């Protein structure tokens, strides 16, 4: 019985830890100026093996499950609400590209706090590593899948004469 109480207590504290840490990381991430994400950073580059996002769909079937991911705006009102994308124009698409970069960065950073469990019991460590990966990697994959497609759409819009000022 003591062991069960200990596990329940540990699970509760781990859950609270992740809730507080991830909400704070997301909140801080929304405060990073857009100009940071307009620059070309290597971490946001689409690599050759990704084949403009096709790799992610071929190996992870992104199109089949990406719509099931909770929209971050439902948890944090500072996160870009994709539902307000009413018109497809270069300004809106550029904003979406910026937000894919922001989301990817936030979710990479959200994995890092798992190091606090490094000295903990093996089971606690493994469960928290699993949680950190399951909660963040799918979102990173979706961003890496969507961004090249949005970038291509932006190029098409600009080529057709719609200019972004």
Curated annotation (Swiss-Prot):
Any one GO CC term of the record: plasma membrane
Enzyme Commission identifier(s): 2.3.1.-
Compartments in which it is found: Cell membrane
Single GO biological process annotation from the record: carotenoid biosynthetic process
InterPro entries reported for this sequence: CrtO
Pathway connected to this protein: Carotenoid biosynthesis; staphyloxanthin biosynthesis; staphyloxanthin from farnesyl diphosphate: step 5/5
Keyword Chloroplast: no
TM ranges: 126-145
Source taxon at top rank: Bacteria
Membrane topology per record: Single-pass membrane protein
Listed GO MF terms: acyltransferase activity
Signal sequence, renumbered to the chain: 1-28
Similarity section: Belongs to the acyltransferase CrtO family.
Protein name, UniProt field: Glycosyl-4,4'-diaponeurosporenoate acyltransferase
Species name: Staphylococcus aureus (strain bovine RF122 / ET3-1)
């Amino acid at each position: 019985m003591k062991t069960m109480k200990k596990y329940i207590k540990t699970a509760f504290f781990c859950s609270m830890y992740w809730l507080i840490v991830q909400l704070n990381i997301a909140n801080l991430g929304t405060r990073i100026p857009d100009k940071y994400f307009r620059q070309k950073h290597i971490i946001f580059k689409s690599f050759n093996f990704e084949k403009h996002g096709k790799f992610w769909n071929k190996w992870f079937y992104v199109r089949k499950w990406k719509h099931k991911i909770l929209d971050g705006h439902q948890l944090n009102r500072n996160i870009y609400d994709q539902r307000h994308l009413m018109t497809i124009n270069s300004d809106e698409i550029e904003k979406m590209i910026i937000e894919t970069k922001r989301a990817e960065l936030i979710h990479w950073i959200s994995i890092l706090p798992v190091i606090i469990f490094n000295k903990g019991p093996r089971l606690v460590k493994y469960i928290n590593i699993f949680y950190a990966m399951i909660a963040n990697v799918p979102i990173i994959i979706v961003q890496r899948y969507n961004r090249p497609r949005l970038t291509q759409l932006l190029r098409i819009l600009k080529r057709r004469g719609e200019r972004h000022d």
